[in-house]
């Protein structure tokens, strides 16, 4: 009887608890409208340890951030070189990037890789710098290997020829690829043939490049006077300073030469650049204009938010329009690239079916215009800010990100608290700020609409595209960015049907 009473008492208590939870849930649901996005909370406060900085006699700038949270350390070396125009030997830097880091003059490639693997470390060396990371106990040795790879790179004719041939094969593979042709022509036309960002690698330029060219390129542009070494992690400043001085102090400094090149310009009025790819089953449509855009711009953060709302991801307007609503593409995105050495780019892009190529081009222009002519919605603004906050916080887990922040503050002359206040600046952006930034950077009246695809199926409709009440001028190019006459294009078109 006692057991029955206890059981009944327990059941009664459980029923009361359930009743309370149901009533509480009902009350909460009555107060919470799930159709309304909750308001964003305050931006999390971010504090970066201020690096301790010193310079070696050869000009190498070293920044050390002590962080004993985990028994790990990393080193990031980068060169703040000017943009480099390679000219007749375009591609030599690409060959070089694959050669460095594969052993040194004192350590064979096999021994080099084996030792890195044994320590469970990472060491990546390219023509523009190096990154290394490991557990604390291995870090001194990893730093030694990094210094050896940078100061005593191993360049052999055999490895040079191997890497050159790999790039040649890659070029052959991309001969009929619509995306590859689009990228090449877009860069060339946007920046120009004499601009480092406009030149492209060809079989001919690779044939002209020699091993000595690669060695000269490395020696000319790998100088401590233009280099920054950022060390982060469980290290002691005095010990690291002594170690770095021993390893990098003998590195010979030299003046890094820079070349002049014309500044890219936008067209006087919007135009279409058409590139015929006879085998294309889809078209690449890109709306591109150049902009003066870097971290010191007063509307920098507003422009970032504007781009996020337009096409910075799967929640962007371009994606929702061309993918979710119309089903024309697997994805449509936008970007705004920054540079403190030349002009950056605004790009809105989609890869679509041939039959909707002209319509996609019009929709991209319309979405860009909409950003300029109307305010974004509150939920779009809040979502963009939340996405930036999440991405920014997650990025801080990567030591190379922190190293990049420290380097940027020096090379771009930014305030010391620039990244500490990054999220605050993002969250202070208003709808008015977004619209003004769109007006400043989304230059739909002076832009190029690049369309790369199968002319026999899309050219007629492209030539009838209208913008602002009049037909858009069309210019014709081959896949190597050579401008051609329409009649020549039509001749090739007729020959394909013979």
What is each residue range found by the language model?
Residues 75-136, 196-200, 312-328, 340:
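M16/MPP (pitrilysin/insulinase) zinc-metallopeptidase core fold and M16-derived inactive scaffolds
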Residues 103-106, 134-164, 294, 337-395, ...:
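M16/insulysin-pitrilysin zinc metalloprotease superfamily fold
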Residues 166-185, 263-282, 323-329, 374, ...:
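Short acidic/His-enriched helical or mixed secondary-structure segments at domain edges of catalytic enzymes
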Residues 286-288, 310-352:
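A structural supersecondary motif
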Residues 32-40, 228-294, 453-493:
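An aromatic/glycine/proline-enriched structural segment found at the starts
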Residues 9, 32-35, 39, 113-217, ...:
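Acidic/histidine-enriched segments that form metal/cofactor-coordinating
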Residues 15-26:
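Bacterial N-terminal signal peptides
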Residues 35-54, 188-227, 259-264, 293-295, ...:
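Histidine-acidic residue clusters that define the catalytic metal-binding segment
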